[in-house]
């Protein structure tokens, strides 16, 4: 099995290193990842300046672009083959609920799915640097084997969130729905020494709704969460109501 790995934390991130080491047990591993931190870039694609790729080891490339760029460049140029699976991660921090819309990790897996390649996004749910990447990586190896054997439904990829716990403390994996986050974002408004305003976007607290069966509900109780995501963003529950609108 030929495996393409990427992430949004950068090519030298510990989560990516742990994943590459573990995945080597089941196939040939190739890494095409950003040369720097690219968290929260979403599904951004670089279109207005050229990309550059640097080979830092035989099968490892660093790209001065986004995770989506890395998947595109890897599959269409840097590799001489189409990978059997793409795995994005292991992200430092969870990708849960509505936050997946910001995630470069999740978007890289989505990009592979657009190309018809089975894909998994995986994150370690931690508030710090995380110490249990190896446990998460071991689970991804098992899951990748299942995906290789069973396949995935059309236009579907998996978003996996693993609690930052030793392997022996992790509870069994569960299939979950995408959860919901309560947004209470803050803007930090400051003035630099030259009198110019500058801003930081962010929030201290991530407040998720504890919805039964959701990704957050699972990981907050020590379970590994596996959420099937798909490319069609249509809200089918709203179609009937909207079709009753008088748009003439």
Curated annotation (Swiss-Prot):
UniProt main location, coarse: cytoplasm
Keywords recorded for this protein, A-Z: Cytoplasm, Hydrolase, Metal-binding, Nucleotide-binding
Single Gene Ontology MF annotation: exopolyphosphatase activity
Cofactor: a divalent metal cation
Class of enzymatic activity (EC top level): hydrolase
Record-listed a divalent metal cation binding positions: 8-9, 39, 91
EC nos: 3.1.3.5
GO-annotated cellular components: cytoplasm
Gene3D superfamilies on file: Survival protein SurE-like phosphatase/nucleotidase (3.40.1210.10)
InterPro entries named among the record's database cross-references: SurE, SurE-like_Pase/nucleotidase, SurE-like_sf
Location within or outside the cell: Cytoplasm
Cofactor mode of binding and number, as noted: Binds 1 divalent metal cation per subunit.
Organism superkingdom: Bacteria
Catalytic activity line of the entry: a ribonucleoside 5'-phosphate + H2O = a ribonucleoside + phosphate
Physiological role: Nucleotidase that shows phosphatase activity on nucleoside 5'-monophosphates.
Family: Belongs to the SurE nucleotidase family.
Protein name: 5'-nucleotidase SurE
